[in-house]
UniProtKB/Swiss-Prot annotation:
Region (Ferredoxin-reductase): 95-326
Cofactor: FAD; [2Fe-2S] cluster
Disulfide bond residue pairs: none
Protein name per the record: Toluene-4-monooxygenase system, ferredoxin--NAD(+) reductase component
Cofactor note: Binds 1 FAD per subunit. Binds 1 2Fe-2S cluster.
Provenance organism: Ectopseudomonas mendocina
Highest classification ranks of the organism: Bacteria, Pseudomonadati, Pseudomonadota, Gammaproteobacteria, Pseudomonadales
Length: 326
């Protein structure tokens, strides 16, 4: 085990050579800045002041080459090779309620929702604990580790993931096409979790496989007997995925699902409004002011919706919770 110490003395923890600095800090239940845990966002940047690390992904998009030359690294993409002294660059926004743990699961079933997106149902030996909205790191030996969000309410030892097979994506394609009986998971991770109070209406906005955490959060609210309006905007270019959304969310009178097709070809009968999600929301915006907003999808979608909410409609930043898929 190696000792990790930050220059401001706020972060002091131990890490072994098999753990990233980020995972080790979160296992120690420390407040540490991060978002994607996949090298894309750059939220977990550190400056290495003393010691040596193994950089798992030198070309990670979350870190510019000039920053690497300044001895900066991503905590989610480096492992310690010695005792370290570090400087944490960004300010942490909050603490997750469940420290991540490694555990084994058995693949119970796989159900395709479209040609590209599928649902994996897993079963662990122990109770799987997480907050609705969080994700898990899924390891496929020799191929890599990827982050996938839980798509079910907390339910004993079962866990449901929704995965989108990405062209040339080694992990997602292996999960889609191969018969895999067991999977190693690490989690939960993520700070964009369900925070809605009983007196506040809730709005969920997702694109593609970003639907997964929304299904978890919405169905949790339904199970809890939440009575305020729930509005879901879901965008996809595949009609099969829009149809799947209608079955993934539990039914309740206060739930309104608005599917949006981003493809005219995939919306041949024009069953759904065509365009991007952020282009459809304005016609509903007047009735949504004062809500808590939850966003999940690719960075471009998140940025467009944030602009719509904060700049054009003055929604406070504190009322917007987002998870960007990189």
């Amino acid at each position: 085990m190696f000792n990790i110490q930050s220059d401001d003395l706020l972060h002091h923890f131990e890490a072994d050579s098999n753990d990233t600095l980020l995972s080790a800090a979160l296992r120690a239940e420390l407040v540490f800045p991060y978002e994607c845990n996949s090298g894309g966002c750059g939220a977990c940047k550190i400056e290495l002041l003393e010691g040596e690390v193994s950089n798992l992904w030198p070309d990670a998009p979350g870190l510019a080459a000039r920053e690497l030359r300044k001895n900066r690294f991503l905590a989610c993409q480096c492992k310690p090779l010695s005792d370290l002294k570090i400087k944490v660059i960004n300010r942490a926004e909050g603490r997750a309620s469940h420290p991540p743990k490694r555990f084994s699961t058995r693949v119970v079933s796989k159900r395709f929702l479209s040609d590209e997106m599928f649902e994996l149902r897993l079963e662990a030996e122990q109770k799987v604990v997480f907050s609705p909205g969080q994700y898990f790191m899924v390891d496929v030996p020799e191929l890599g580790t990827r982050a996938y969000s839980a798509a079910n309410p907390v339910d004993g030892n079962t866990l449901t993931l929704i995965v989108k097979a990405v062209p040339n994506g080694k992990v997602s394609c292996a999960l889609a096409n191969e018969t895999i009986e067991t999977l190693q998971l690490d989690g939960p991770y993520g700070l964009s979790v369900l925070k809605t109070a009983d007196e506040t209406q809730s709005v969920f906005i997702a694109g593609g496989s970003g639907i997964a955490p929304m299904v978890s959060m919405v169905n949790t609210l339904i199970a809890q007997g939440y009575e305020k309006p729930i509005t879901v905007f879901y965008g996809s270019r595949l009609e099969a995925e829009l149809e799947a959304a209608e079955t993934l969310f539990g039914w309740k009178e206060n739930l309104k699902l608005i599917n949006v097709s981003s493809s005219v070809v995939g919306n041949s009968e024009k069953k759904y409004p065509t365009g991007y999600v952020h282009e459809i929301i304005p016609e509903y915006m007047e009735g949504l002011l004062g809500a808590e907003f939850y966003l999940c999808g690719p960075p471009q979608m998140i940025n467009s919706v944030q602009k719509l909410l904060m700049i054009e409609n003055k929604v406070p930043f504190e009322a917007i919770h987002f998870d960007r898929f990189f």
